[in-house]
C-alpha cells in the first residue's frame, strides 16, 4: 500500500510489531500448557499491537487481508443466522491461506498491470442483498485501486515479491508454529464450508477500501483462488 498508493508506513512501528511477534513465536509451544510466560507474552503482544495501531492511526499493524477474509466468512454466516467461531481462530486459518498465496505469486511470471475490470453483478450476487449496500459504499463512486497507476504495479512487482519473501514466514513454518500452539489450521476446524471458504478468498477484497496485494490482483488478471488451488 505504501509503494503503490502512498499509504503511511513507519519502520519503527513495524519493528515494534515484529519484536512482539518474534517473542510470541518463540513461546508457541508453551501456549497449550497455559504457561504464565506465554500468557504474559500474548497480553504484551496485544497491547503492543494496540499501541502500534494508535501510532500508525490505522489498524494495519494488526490487521491485514487475513482479517478481511475472516470478516467475510463471519458476515456471510450471520446472514444465515449463524454465529461464527472466534474471530481469531478464523484469522489464523486465513493467515495460512494468504501466506500460501503470496509466496506462490513470487513463482509466477511477472505480470503487466492494467485498470481492473470487475463483474459487479457477480460480486453483488455473492454478497447477497443484505451485505451488498454496505459493500458498495466502499467501492463507489470509484474503487481504491482506481487511484493506483497500473504502470506502478508492474514497476514495483518484483520489489513487492521481495518483501513477501523477506517478511512473511513460509506456510510450512506457520503450520509448525500453529501446531505447537494447538491452533486451528483448517476450514473444518472453524466450521467454514468449502463454498464459503473459496468465496472468502475471492470476494473479500471488496469488503474494505484498503490496498492489499489481494486487492491488486484483478489488475494483473490473477485469481487468488486459482493460485491457492494450484490451477
PLM regions with names:
Residues 33-42, 59-63, 80-89, 107-114, ...:
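Flexible, glycine/charged-enriched surface loops at secondary-structure junctions
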Residues 105-231:
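C-terminal charged capping/lid subdomain of soluble metabolic enzymes
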Residues 39-53, 95, 178, 200-205:
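Short alpha-helical scaffolding segments that buttress acidic/His motifs in well-ordered protein cores
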Residues 5, 9-16, 34, 57, ...:
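Catalytic cores of large soluble enzymes that bind and process phosphate-bearing ligands
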Residues 47-104:
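Acidic catalytic cores of enzymes that act on phosphate-bearing nucleotides/polynucleotides
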Amino acid at each position: 500500500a505504501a509503494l503503490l498508493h502512498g499509504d503511511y508506513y513507519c519502520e519503527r512501528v513495524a519493528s515494534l510489531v515484529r519484536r512482539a511477534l518474534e517473542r510470541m513465536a518463540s513461546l508457541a509451544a508453551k501456549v497449550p500448557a497455559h504457561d504464565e510466560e506465554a500468557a504474559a507474552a500474548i497480553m504484551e503482544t496485544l497491547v503492543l499491537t494496540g499501541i502500534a495501531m494508535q501510532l500508525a492511526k490505522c489498524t494495519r499493524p494488526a490487521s491485514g487481508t487475513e482479517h478481511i477474509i475472516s470478516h467475510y466468512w463471519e458476515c456471510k454466516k450471520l446472514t444465515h443466522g449463524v454465529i461464527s467461531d472466534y474471530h481469531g481462530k478464523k484469522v489464523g486459518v486465513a493467515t495460512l491461506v494468504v501466506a500460501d498465496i503470496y509466496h506462490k505469486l513470487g513463482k509466477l511470471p511477472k505480470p503487466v498491470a492494467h485498470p481492473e475490470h470487475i463483474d459487479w453483478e457477480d460480486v453483488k450476487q455473492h454478497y447477497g442483498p443484505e451485505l451488498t449496500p454496505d459493500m458498495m459504499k466502499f467501492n463507489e463512486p470509484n474503487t481504491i485501486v482506481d487511484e493506483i497507476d497500473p504502470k506502478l504495479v508492474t514497476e514495483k512487482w518484483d520489489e513487492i515479491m521481495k518483501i513477501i519473501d523477506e517478511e512473511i514466514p513460509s506456510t510450512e513454518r506457520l503450520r509448525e508454529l500453529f501446531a505447537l500452539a494447538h491452533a486451528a489450521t483448517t476450514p473444518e476446524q472453524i466450521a467454514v464450508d468449502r463454498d464459503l471458504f473459496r468465496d472468502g478468498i475471492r470476494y473479500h477484497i471488496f469488503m474494505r477500501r484498503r490496498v492489499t496485494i489481494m486487492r491488486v490482483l484483478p489488475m494483473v488478471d490473477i485469481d487468488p483462488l486459482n493460485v491457492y488451488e494450484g490451477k
